[in-house]
Amino acid sequence: MLQEEADTVLFSGDLTTTSLDSEFREVADAFSPLYEKWGDNLIVIPGNHDRYTPKSVKAKLYEKYFPRAFAGSGDRVFSKTLSDDVCVIGFDSSKPFMLRSNGDFTLELKEEIDAEFEKSKQLHKHIILMGHFPYSYPSDVPSKFHHKLLGEESLAELISRHNPIAYLHGHKHVRWCLRDAVTPETLCINAGPSGMSSSDPDKHAGWMIFDVTESGNIDQLIKVHLSKDGEPVRETVDLN
């Protein structure tokens, strides 16, 4: 990833597997070169695996090892300017469920995001929203109760009103992009896993790259996965 010449790097969570101190320490070391290159333009939010146990949340392990991430301030919602016309709004809907992998999109969280949209719209023409959990799935990837965002319909309703140009997320460890019928103006992008191994390129370690045009369109969406030799393999996604 250090080879990429991106303006901004967005990471939508699941830095760890079970939110152990040793895992956070290892990941923080791995992210150090990325922070050296991108600084505050490397934007990280936690996933459910980073809030996996009540003990890790109480100890604030995520905040300890990623103090530059937005949740280090104690907030669950943030916004950051990416250019004169574009900003990103991120939110943290992860909490420890122990035997389940749900997120929780509460009314309070929805109200905070609503307020952040209203504020950001005064300053920027185009907004990208980033959370950890999807609210829409491809037909071949079923949504399961024990793994879904509780309140995903409420998130979809919020997005249908504010029409961000994209919703970036993760959680399901497979790369995809789609437009949901409820939110046709918003492109949902799942960057997939950054560190897994699979014979399926969309489930293998990689990321997604895209540009935002002056008119706010998502342009040049590219899937990237790593070859056996660790070299990036690129595939342009047809958005038509």
Which residue ranges define each predicted feature?
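N-terminal active-site segment of His-dependent metallophosphoesterases
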Residues: 1-25, 240
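A general structural motif
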Residues: 5-6, 39, 122-126, 164, ...
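Active-site neighborhood of phospho(di)ester-bond hydrolases with catalytic His/Asp-centered motifs
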Residues: 8-14, 41-48, 92, 128-131, ...
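Active-site environment of divalent metal-dependent phosphoester hydrolases
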Residues: 17-20, 44-56, 96-100, 133-139, ...
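Extended active-site neighborhood of metal-dependent phosphoesterases/phosphodiesterases
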Residues: 25-115, 154-160, 182-188, 206-210
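Active-site-proximal segments of metal-dependent phosphoesterases and phosphodiesterases across multiple
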Residues: 101-104, 120-165, 172
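Conserved beta-sheet core of the metallophosphoesterase superfamily
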Residues: 144-215
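A short C-terminal boundary segment appended to hydrolase-like catalytic domains
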Residues: 212-240
